Amino acid sequence: MTSLQLQMETVTLEQYEALPENVRAEVFDGVIYDMASPSQSHQIILTELLVLIRNYLRKQKGKCQVFPAPFDVKLSDKPLTIVQPDIMVVCDADKLDEKRCNGAPDFIIEIVSPGNPANDYIRKLYYYKNAGVREYWIVDPRRKIVTVNYFEKNILNIQYSFDSIIKVNIYDELLIDFSEIAELLET
């Protein structure tokens, strides 16, 4: 399913917050877009990555926290840009309030929806890089590819297959074995 523009005029934060709870949407430059519901494979990947990252962060006993969607990230006020990454890691607690992360998370993972891959590969890549996200992964279940963008070192579009062990660059020792996740998708 492609993302649909919900209204033509630009929206305010108040209008966005007034949307019904069951509406999944993101705002880019003041324009609100509908989000498709995730697939089963999307949710399997999300759950596995979330648990792996959470367990690593707990062992580190650091200040970083991991959040799954739906949790808003307000990248800018004017024009309003609010996204809901599939997974994000935030290491600056001052960016967090009860409603959202205000500013760029340190690490974002998006799992590609079949109907609108350009949203993750182009639009969000642009917004995340410009907002100051340190690292951004695009996980594509259909193509079985993970694209790593390590903005902090200007390393872009490094692709790995689902049989790879991939290092999370912002951490010294966090490795994700995608072959284990791929096995779960085949059962």
Where do the model's predicted regions map?
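Gly/Pro/Ser/Thr-rich low-complexity, intrinsically disordered segments predominantly at protein N-termini
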Residues: 1-187
